[in-house]
């Protein structure tokens, strides 16, 4: 891959954007890490200028003729250029077991030629999530890029660097490992404080619940990892939220499996709320669901002040977006 010219007017910059790796895989705008203050912005190339030392392991070499920023350093460079809410979303994705990735037709064709029908198979590292009709989607399953412990450790190491305050503030909001954008959106609406537009509830993601004998007979599972576990302040009341995304839960088989798991958890005494995107994105419907959840938690649902309502509206504008275009 050719080097990036420093000058914004250098015609080689546009030719770089036509390179197959950029055009069909990385996409534009192309974000590059650079030193020096010249040419930070361009039509299809965005330079993230970083002068001075970088945290150890910030840059990794690849077999494609270019170096890339590590996931943690990528988040740090983003911290000073995106809202804290968007940074939280990026952290959830990198610490989670999913990715949203649009595959260009040329890349898909190359994958099909190399791997056949197995191009989206989990055995190749990333597993493509198919919709109810069996068609590929932009949602993928993959191992986490960042461990939660590494996120916290990195936040402690970067104090004083540009973007560190925003990074640390966002890292404190990550409640666990999630498996889809819907789980991220739900976790942020439930978990962020009312001063940030959320509901300020205590929650954890995908915590292990060991099934009782009766629950195992119903579900056929030894353990379950519910999407969201909500609890009241003293932990005496709990409520489970299962996010029902169309891509994962749309098929008949998935619905039957979800029903078995839900019944098994209810048999163990857990209230279970099945949350859809429609219920989450519609503020009035979300309020009704919140009333149900708070009744399970034996907590009053306090009305939001006009200021808190405005903060929730802004939060919703930040999180309900085209995730692939973020």
Task: Give short role names for the model-derived ranges.
Residues 1-162, 301-305, 314-326:
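Short gly/ser-rich loop at a beta-strand->alpha-helix junction or flexible surface loop bordering the NTP-binding
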Residues 115, 119, 130-326:
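Surface segments flanking catalytic/ligand-binding clefts of nucleic-acid enzymes
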